[in-house]
Amino acid sequence: MNEVEFLEYIIKSIVSNKDAVSIERVEDELWVLLTLKVDKNDMWTIIWKSGNTINSIRNIIRIFWIQLNKKINIKVLD
Protein backbone atom coordinates (compact mmCIF):
# COMPACT_ATOMS: atom_id res chain seq x y z
CA MET A 1 0.00 0.00 0.00
CA ASN A 2 1.44 3.38 -0.97
CA GLU A 3 0.80 6.73 0.72
CA VAL A 4 -2.05 7.67 -1.65
CA GLU A 5 -3.92 4.43 -1.01
CA PHE A 6 -3.30 4.76 2.72
CA LEU A 7 -4.55 8.37 2.80
CA GLU A 8 -7.59 7.39 0.74
CA TYR A 9 -8.33 4.56 3.18
CA ILE A 10 -8.15 6.91 6.18
CA ILE A 11 -10.24 9.66 4.58
CA LYS A 12 -12.92 7.30 3.25
CA SER A 13 -13.29 5.80 6.70
CA ILE A 14 -14.29 9.16 8.23
CA VAL A 15 -16.33 10.92 5.50
CA SER A 16 -19.95 10.39 4.47
CA ASN A 17 -19.58 10.73 0.69
CA LYS A 18 -16.84 8.24 -0.11
CA ASP A 19 -17.30 8.62 -3.88
CA ALA A 20 -16.30 12.32 -3.73
CA VAL A 21 -12.84 11.59 -2.31
CA SER A 22 -9.99 12.17 -4.75
CA ILE A 23 -6.26 12.50 -4.19
CA GLU A 24 -3.67 13.87 -6.58
CA ARG A 25 0.04 13.20 -6.03
CA VAL A 26 2.82 15.51 -7.26
CA GLU A 27 6.49 14.82 -6.50
CA ASP A 28 9.70 16.77 -7.04
CA GLU A 29 13.25 16.29 -5.71
CA LEU A 30 12.44 17.28 -2.13
CA TRP A 31 8.67 17.23 -1.66
CA VAL A 32 5.64 15.07 -2.23
CA LEU A 33 2.35 16.97 -2.30
CA LEU A 34 -0.92 15.11 -1.87
CA THR A 35 -3.91 17.23 -2.84
CA LEU A 36 -7.12 16.02 -1.23
CA LYS A 37 -10.63 16.81 -2.45
CA VAL A 38 -13.72 15.82 -0.50
CA ASP A 39 -17.40 16.69 -0.64
CA LYS A 40 -18.24 20.13 0.72
CA ASN A 41 -20.40 18.55 3.44
CA ASP A 42 -17.46 16.45 4.63
CA MET A 43 -15.00 19.33 5.01
CA TRP A 44 -15.91 19.80 8.68
CA THR A 45 -14.94 16.18 9.32
CA ILE A 46 -11.48 16.69 7.83
CA ILE A 47 -10.74 20.13 9.33
CA TRP A 48 -12.56 19.61 12.64
CA LYS A 49 -11.37 21.45 15.77
CA SER A 50 -8.87 23.91 14.27
CA GLY A 51 -7.37 21.33 11.95
CA ASN A 52 -6.61 18.68 14.55
CA THR A 53 -7.95 15.87 12.36
CA ILE A 54 -6.01 16.77 9.20
CA ASN A 55 -2.88 17.54 11.20
CA SER A 56 -3.02 14.09 12.79
CA ILE A 57 -3.49 12.50 9.37
CA ARG A 58 -0.52 14.50 8.02
CA ASN A 59 1.69 13.20 10.83
CA ILE A 60 0.72 9.61 10.10
CA ILE A 61 1.39 9.99 6.36
CA ARG A 62 4.78 11.62 6.99
CA ILE A 63 5.97 8.37 8.54
CA PHE A 64 6.03 6.91 5.01
CA TRP A 65 8.64 9.42 3.93
CA ILE A 66 11.03 9.66 6.88
CA GLN A 67 13.28 6.92 5.53
CA LEU A 68 13.35 8.43 2.01
CA ASN A 69 14.56 11.84 3.19
CA LYS A 70 11.65 13.56 1.49
CA LYS A 71 9.04 15.84 2.94
CA ILE A 72 5.36 15.26 2.38
CA ASN A 73 2.42 17.59 2.74
CA ILE A 74 -1.32 17.23 2.35
CA LYS A 75 -3.32 20.10 0.92
CA VAL A 76 -7.10 20.08 1.34
CA LEU A 77 -9.04 21.81 -1.42
CA ASP A 78 -12.44 23.29 -0.67
Predicted regions and their residues:
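Glycine-centered tight-turn and secondary-structure capping sites
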Residues: 47-51
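RNA-contacting regions in translation and RNA-metabolism proteins
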Residues: 1-45, 55-78
